[in-house]
Amino acid sequence: MSKQTIVLLYGGRSAEREVSVLSAESVMRAINYDKFHVKTYFISQAGDFYKTQEFTVQPSESEKLMTNASLDASLKIKASDIYEDKAVVFPLLHGPMGEDGSIQGFLEILKMPYVGTNILSSSVAMDKITTKRVLESAGIPQVNYTVYIEGNDLEDCITETLETLSFPIFVKPANMGSSVGISKAESIEGLREAIALALKYDSRILIEQGVVAREIEVGLLGNTKVASTLPGEVIKDVAFYDYQAKYIDNKISMAIPATIDEGITSQMRYFAEQAFKAIGACGLSRCDFFLAEDGNLYLNELNTMPGFTQWSMYPLLWDNMGLSYSDLIEELVSLAEEMFQKRESHLI
């Protein structure tokens, strides 16, 4: 029986490109090579495409993918050269130009099935402000927030924020993930500095009420029918779970499943599934919650392409449900093919 090709797209132009490389290297080792043949393509920080390694058997732990530090100009290709009939693309790309609908639109033009959610849902979920407004309309609880758009009056925004929120306050670029560009403000001066930092990454800024809370995450999997995992908890050794703590210092651990009251667990899974449906997601997502000290539950973020290394929360949540890392990848490929056929059938 001939093997099906999985195309791994990794790298990208966003500040989250290093996370993408880690995810791709994990996936290429976990794939079932009895069924699949793997081709990898790197998108450089400049936005160019490079044809990198191919694998017909499981690569060794020492095998590393091309990065911006090891570019080989002779491997540069046209973006459309990734096309292969009947191949499925796994876009292991995070942040802008990766999970914001850009690459999804490109793959739909190429008529290639791809893992993950569609153009519109990717765009909505990538923008934290738009996500909040959609989830508000679905009745899903969230922390209070204000918004600053570059070009608007900053002083008016600060006045509104001080009237609406209390310190500590978190300031976030609307279109970044992995905690890139996010900072915590505990004073008016700190708020100004946090907004200035966030503006380096985006022109749309989300300003949120800080809460003392446990950080709980739920995995989602499916297309028109969605399944959710039992929650897992992020346990921090730092005050703020930022990019450095997540990916460099390893100052976090995870409790899977989280120790949570059964009623709250059910409520959390319900809200996660409703959020997935509200944005029209498909394939996979990870829903992140705050469980406050007073027992209130707030949906913090919906991530349509969560970190996908073997030690990332999303695969571990599914492993706890009895779905192994390798089988999860296979299920995502199947869901990608299902959605591709559905999209094609709608083009009447």
Curated annotation (Swiss-Prot):
Signal peptide positions on this chain: none
Cofactor remark: Binds 2 magnesium or manganese ions per subunit.
Keyword ATP-binding in annotation: yes
UniProt catalytic activity: 2 D-alanine + ATP = D-alanyl-D-alanine + ADP + phosphate + H(+)
EC number: 6.3.2.4
Claim: Cell wall biogenesis/degradation is one of the keywords in the record: yes
GO BP term, pick one: regulation of cell shape
Residues that bind Mg(2+) 1: 288, 301
Residues noted as binding Mg(2+) 2 in the record, renumbered to the chain: 301, 303
Cofactors: Mg(2+); Mn(2+)
Residues annotated as domain ATP-grasp: 132-334
Pathway: Cell wall biogenesis; peptidoglycan biosynthesis
InterPro entries cross-referenced by the UniProt entry: ATP-grasp (IPR011761), ATP_grasp_subdomain_1 (IPR013815), D-Ala_lig_Van_CS (IPR000291), D_ala_D_ala (IPR005905), Dala_Dala_lig_C (IPR011095), Dala_Dala_lig_N (IPR011127), PreATP-grasp_dom_sf (IPR016185)
GO cellular component: cytosol
Subcellular location: Cytoplasm
Chain sites annotated for binding ATP: 162-217
Keywords, in A-Z order: ATP-binding, Cell shape, Cell wall biogenesis/degradation, Cytoplasm, Ligase, Magnesium, Manganese, Metal-binding, Nucleotide-binding, Peptidoglycan synthesis
Pfam family, one: Dala_Dala_lig_C
GO molecular function: ATP binding; D-alanine-D-alanine ligase activity; metal ion binding
Role description: Cell wall formation.
Protein family according to the UniProt entry: Belongs to the D-alanine--D-alanine ligase family.
Protein name: D-alanine--D-alanine ligase
Annotated source species: Streptococcus uberis (strain ATCC BAA-854 / 0140J)
Taxonomic path: Bacteria, Bacillati, Bacillota, Bacilli, Lactobacillales
